[in-house]
UniProtKB/Swiss-Prot annotation:
Region annotation (Disordered) ranges: 253-309
Name by which UniProt lists this protein: Putative B3 domain-containing protein Os04g0346900
UniProt keyword annotation of Acetylation present: no
Keywords on record: DNA-binding, Nucleus, Repeat, Transcription, Transcription regulation
DNA-binding region per UniProt: 25-118, 140-236, 320-427
Originating species: Oryza sativa subsp. japonica
Length: 427
């Protein structure tokens, strides 16, 4: 959407860097959307004397042939939002929960790029120019990936992107080239199997060399002939400027960061990752028993059943927690989560949490492939003294709709405090 420049991040007016921000859309984003202070300042919004909010109007370019006026305002706490007109803009372009948007300000216009649940750039109006021939960078195909646990050493290219933009001749190649933000080119092996197409050998080394880590979001712009140019956004949504910030570059020396394996029974980073610290697991779950004479204690049988729900989790820029589901969880319709984990992501009071599942379905045709869609459930998250819980009718419905069984493992990745992506590892 809108006109866009190079992902490398050029200068704006008067030599100032152009403000860029990546946002993930949560249910509340469709009424108003929080933006960073730098972007708000470039849109002309500051805090007046006495802390009184100031408002401005941003000109948002749309490929649908209309220029949208969207209000920018700070609330009483000084936080900046896109407000009046934003809900109409989002509805007109079909933006959805779990999508990513990139906001770029330049030339007096706010441009918006939207990546849907396929992780591909959503095309509005005319399709992107044929890969390799486009001279306007805004017309080149793009996709993004969130670096989550388990995909650091091998990254899957979205099936839709492969089907739409990568030719059969290119797929016969065993090598892709990545143009890094430092101006270097990297050769990465192209792996293919029945499940999809991946960036394989050399990918982890590329990440390690550039200091790109878990929780970062990488956007790939396709130059054609298996050549990709990338830009990187940190978990705070700000684009990383490798040159200006002097990010330390290091070679893998045997101590490079390793993606956690969900088959392991502990995590390597003791400061950020913990196993079996479900603080509530040795406590009686709320509303789970009646009239116990040993308050605060569980029977040996109950303790044994509850131990199976212990978790592996990581607290970090892109926090995640892995939980094994057992009969106790399904019968009681309540799932305990480690107190430390909940506190770290800002879940400190009862909240409505959106659980999102990405569904991939096979498509028919000469080239085959798959398409993706998202489904979501509203679940109550409740904080108690020693733990927090997902519970109630929403959690029951989630389990029923997804056929969750005893022995399955749910991996919750926190995209936002109240928006979690869920992947289910079947037993």
């Amino acid at each position: 959407m809108g006109s866009r420049g190079d992902h490398g991040g050029g200068g704006g007016g008067r030599g100032a860097a152009r403000a860029t921000q990546l946002k993930v859309l949560v249910p509340s984003s469709f009424r108003k959307m929080r933006i960073c202070d730098e972007l708000a300042a470039q849109l002309g919004v500051g805090v007046g004397g006495g802390g009184a909010p100031r408002a401005a109007t941003a000109r948002v370019a749309s490929p649908l042939g209309k220029a949208w006026d969207v209000g920018v305002v700070r609330d009483g706490d000084g936080r900046a939002f896109l407000g009046r007109g934003w809900a109409e803009f989002a509805a007109a372009h079909g933006l959805g929960v779990g999508w990513f948007v990139v906001l770029r300000h330049g030339g007096g216009v706010l441009a918006v790029e939207a990546f849907d649940t396929t992780c591909c750039l959503r095309v509005f109006g005319a399709p992107p120019a044929e890969a390799g021939r486009a001279t306007d960078t805004s017309r080149k195909p793009q996709f993004l990936t969130v670096l989550l646990p388990g995909i650091m050493d091998k990254m899957r290219i979205p099936d839709k992107f492969v089907r739409d933009y990568i030719t059969g001749e290119n797929l016969n190649s065993n090598m892709a080239i990545i143009l890094s933000p430092l101006g270097k080119s990297w050769r990465v092996e192209l792996d293919k199997d029945q499940s999809g197409v991946f960036l394989g050998g050399g990918w982890l080394q590329f990440l390690s060399f550039h200091g790109i880590s878990r929780g970062d979001v990488v956007i790939f712009r396709y130059e054609g002939n298996l050549v990709f140019k990338i830009s990187v956004f940190g978990p705070n949504g700000r684009q990383k400027d490798f040159k200006a910030k002097g990010i330390s570059i290091y070679q893998g020396t045997g101590e490079q960061q390793e993606a956690p394996s969900f088959s392991r029974r502990k995590c390597n980073n003791k400061k950020k990752s913990r196993f079996g610290e479900d603080d509530g697991n040795q406590q009686e779950m709320p509303c789970s028993r009646k009239g116990s004479g040993n308050k605060g204690r569980t029977s040996d049988r109950e303790t044994k059943r509850m131990r199976k729900t212990r978790s592996v989790y990581e607290i970090g820029p892109r926090s995640w927690i892995k939980k094994e589901i057992n009969e106790y969880v399904l019968e009681r319709c309540i799932l305990s989560l480690a107190r430390t984990f909940c506190e770290s992501i800002g879940l400190v009071e009862e909240s409505s949490i959106t659980l999102m599942m990405i569904d991939t379905t096979s498509t028919q045709g000469d080239q085959g492939g798959s398409s993706s869609s998202s489904r979501s459930w509203e679940v109550t998250g409740r904080r108690y003294k020693d733990a927090c819980y997902l519970l109630g009718a929403g959690w029951r419905r989630f389990c029923e709709d997804n056929g969750v069984r005893s022995g399955d493992v749910c991996v919750f990745t926190v995209l936002d405090t109240t928006l979690w992506r869920v992947d289910i590892e079947r037993c």
